[in-house]
Amino acid sequence: MFKRTHYDIVICGAGPAGSMAALALKKSGLHVALTDAATFPRDKICGDSVSSVNKRILREVNPELETDLLDFSAKSNITQARLFSPEFRALQVSFKKTGHCIRRIDFDNWLFQHARQSGCDVYENARLKEIEPNDKGYTLTYTNGNKINASVVIGCDGAHSVVAKKLAGFKVDKHHYSGAVRQYYKNVAGNDGNTLEVYFLKDYLPGYFWIFPLSDNTANVGFGMLSQTIADNKIDLKKSIHRIIHNIPQVAERFKDATPLEQPIGFGLPLGSKKYRISGNRFMLCGDAASLIDPFSGEGIETAMESGKFAAEQAVNCFAANRFDAEFMYGYDERVYKKMWPNFRNHYLLQRILGNRTRLINTLIRVGNIPWVNKQIPKLFY
């Protein structure tokens, strides 16, 4: 199966984090393998929001990537967001830079195909089963029995990361984890195609319901809550989203002529509200595998791509210095958290303060319509 028995770097997972790492290693001169359990194109349950920051990250790696994304046809252009309080008062905020909504099956495949052309060896349908240390790095064993050796492993294998569990001992912490469901709909009324919509609903806090517009008059509709709240209250997210869409008049009116394109599908979000050790001897974790999802917005594509880029650059430094020990590798952790922790910390504080405080959320939505306050709100999204 594998072209080589040993690689300088094996990237486990070819989503935004892994593909970006591969792209950033294009000119490194290192032997790189990019592996994924799936065969592309494949779906990834998500809100499908691609912020303007993602374009900056693409530009830093290769300006042609940003240009190619702008020419991508299957996207909506996002210029604003509309937030609804529990009393259904609306707050509209405009973004200085245009973001996009793109189905993950399309966006991830687009990025993956660029990574495939970066010069790395790509292996699809390669599901990691075990990872064990050896005298030159790690031996990775896949479910089909094939093995590969790596000097450095970059774990980009998502919320249920094998690399994170085996090498960093990660376990789910429900206080820093969210559950959500997504359901695609056609013909949802009332959205002009360029607005992210978020509802804070009285009986469904702490959490929010969203309607994000895609191309072709399709919408990504979803609902998410903290996992600890879900467990404590025995909440069924699939039943909850059904009740929201059909039983809340202000929402149901928008869905009376809409058609569901699938059943609700659940997914987990490891939040960046808690710091972890995301590297060690000869390995790094990126994106969802490193719990780098924004604790308030649930945005994870941007941080996945940036952490993938950072990991690639750290790996190059490791080979240049011939140092792969945990102390040297910790430079990756420091860079990631220097960039991301201020937002994570502030957004986690906001998440905790708002909680299920209906009156407070109502008040903040009202205050948000004050012009100088309104200008600060886009930072929660893009």
Question: Residues of each region from the PLM?
Answer:
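Conserved Rossmann-like nucleotide-cofactor binding loop
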Residues: A17, F40, H160
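Conserved hydrophobic helix-helix packing surfaces used for dimerization/oligomerization
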Residues: I9-I11, V32, F283
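Beta1/beta-strand and adjacent pyrophosphate-binding region of the FAD-binding site
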Residues: F2-A17
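A conserved beta-strand/loop capping segment in the N-terminal third of enzymes
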Residues: E60-W110
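Glycine-rich FAD pyrophosphate-binding loop
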Residues: K26-C46
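FAD/FMN-dependent oxidoreductases across multiple families
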Residues: E130, K147, T229-A311, C318
